[in-house]
A protein has these predicted regions:
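Short glycine/threonine-rich loop-to-helix capping motif typified by GTGT followed
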Residues: 146-160
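Glycine- and Gly-Pro-enriched alpha-helical subdomains that act as flexible
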Residues: 103-120, 124
Length: 170
């Protein structure tokens, strides 16, 4: 918030968190830069406290690692404190797990002509829950271009403020 406000009023933000002062990995800033949702700010604070205490913390990820890990963070799938970068909110490999959920999921939805918003929700929402997918990680919905006039589909997408894309059947 301080950085956004400073930009609006043309000021220099001064952010002094313990991780910043000690030049340690700041999970909240990293998540924001990478379009991820933090499941629990309490867990994020506990994670930062572990870093400040000099502890090694773990990283579990469903995604490839494409750069060097920050100091004190090691790749592992269990331990006391760590990050889990995953689309599945049920994955908690550490006693204190900071789940980072990338906003990168698109739903493919087909429906019969005249299908209502409520009917789509009745089918889609329980399936997402079963798969452990948080609604905040969904970016949009895709469907075949034959469905571009389906009010129920548009109502569903609008309700959750998602994008919608249509593709040809080819």
């Amino acid at each position: 918030f301080a950085k956004a406000l400073a930009e609006v009023i043309k000021a220099t933000p001064v952010v002094t968190t313990a991780t910043d002062v000690n030049k340690l990995f700041a999970v909240d800033e990293w998540a924001a830069r990478n379009n991820m949702i933090i499941n629990s700010m309490k867990a994020a604070k506990d994670f930062a406290a572990a870093l400040l205490d000099g502890q090694e913390v773990g990283l579990f990820t469903d995604y490839p690692i494409i750069s060097a890990l920050p100091r004190q963070i090691v790749l592992k799938d269990k331990g006391i404190t760590g990050l889990a970068i995953t689309k599945n909110r049920n994955v908690k490999p550490f006693d204190v797990t900071v789940q980072l959920w990338p906003r990168n999921i698109y739903l493919g939805i087909g429906c019969r002509r005249g299908t209502t918003l409520e009917s789509i929700e009745t089918l889609v929402l329980p399936k997402l829950k079963e798969l452990g997918i948080d609604l905040r990680t969904i970016v949009g919905v895709a469907s075949v271009d034959l469905k571009k006039d389906e009010a129920g589909l548009f109502d569903f997408v609008a309700k959750y403020n998602w994008e919608i894309s249509f593709f040809t059947a080819e």
